[in-house]
């Protein structure tokens, strides 16, 4: 099997992603024909008024930015999950294994509860708090893991990450008990939602995925070496500690940005890489790009279900991913135990 996908394969991935995005833009409480959707988008790009009867505002200003943000978050979370599973050699690992998702959620909840803002930006305070707490969480977890084992052993990182996530979850629930007027909005956000996100979020998510995704993909060869064990990776010239720190920090930054925009969305980084591995195989030079495309499509479909299943009531996207992910988690866990 080739190390990289052919241009034809990438073209198929892109077409599948565009088809999913078109479906999500067209379908909703108000259905819009694909032709009208394309007309509205082209008119917006060219700065021309849309023909009468075309819901340009709904398409261009509401659905399109949301769909783009959903795709970017899905791609980012899935990429982080694939990287963590390769780095930690654990099929049950994803970005949240580090406890970084929980830490970022705590920072964002504190910002929302206290009304932390930055002049000129409605969401800048939440994003900075989420990223800051993601870094603090990573620093704390790695410090504790290093204290237990100077080699930063995988089992130590996972164990401390899980314990930290449970502790942070309790702290978040404690905070929610003191913010009466904001409990509903914060609780909905913590379950994952991209409702109300716009193009500024798209620019931030795109930049984060471009920079952090580039770093992760550049370590694909090292992640392949980790598959045969850390000792063997050292023997083939991999600086294990440097690669671990680089990937862990990059994953933390990317997760922090995603959580600040979408809230905590579970199971994407756990389930999607396994599905992508069935298509692309274990080679991370193929697996990482496949995971990004698959993650984007998966979260787009989950968001579509969340918007339309009980319309006009909108479900949290995290509810949908958890329902699917919980079943998949049990299957993955059973297979891992059976194989082990």
Predicted feature descriptions by range:
Residues 1-340:
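Alpha-helical transmembrane segments in inner-membrane proteins
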């Amino acid at each position: 099997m080739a190390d990289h996908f052919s241009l034809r394969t990438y073209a198929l991935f892109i077409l599948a992603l565009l088809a999913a995005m078109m479906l999500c833009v067209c379908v909703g409480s108000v259905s819009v024909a694909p032709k009208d959707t394309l007309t509205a988008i082209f008119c917006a790009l060219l700065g021309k008024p849309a023909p009468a009867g075309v819901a340009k505002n709904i398409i261009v200003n509401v659905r399109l930015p949301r769909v783009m943000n959903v795709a970017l978050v899905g791609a980012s979370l899935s990429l982080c999950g694939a990287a963590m599973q390769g780095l930690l050699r654990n099929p049950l690992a994803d970005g949240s294994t580090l406890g970084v998702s929980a830490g970022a959620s705590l920072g964002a909840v504190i910002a929302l509860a206290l009304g932390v803002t930055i002049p000129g930006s409605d969401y800048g305070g939440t994003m900075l708090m989420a990223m800051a707490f993601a870094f603090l969480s990573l620093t704390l977890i790695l410090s504790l893991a290093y204290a237990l084992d100077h080699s930063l052993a995988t089992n130590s990182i996972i164990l401390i990450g899980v314990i930290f996530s449970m502790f942070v979850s309790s702290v978040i629930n404690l905070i929610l008990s003191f913010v009466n007027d904001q409990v509903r909005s914060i609780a909905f956000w913590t379950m994952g939602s991209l409702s109300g996100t716009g193009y500024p979020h798209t620019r931030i998510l795109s930049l984060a995925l471009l920079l952090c995704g580039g770093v992760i993909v550049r370590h694909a060869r090292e992640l392949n070496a980790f598959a045969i064990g850390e000792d063997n990776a050292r023997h083939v010239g991999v600086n294990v500690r440097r690669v671990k720190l680089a990937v862990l920090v990059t994953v933390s930054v990317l997760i922090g940005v995603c959580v600040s925009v979408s809230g905590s969305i579970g199971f994407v980084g756990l389930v999607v890489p396994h599905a992508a591995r069935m298509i692309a195989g274990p080679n991370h030079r193929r697996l990482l790009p496949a995971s990004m495309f698959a993650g984007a499509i998966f979260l787009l479909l989950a968001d579509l279900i969340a918007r339309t299943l009980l319309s006009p009531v909108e479900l949290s996207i995290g509810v949908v991913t958890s329902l699917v992910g919980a079943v998949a988690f049990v299957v993955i866990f059973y297979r891992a135990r059976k194989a082990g």
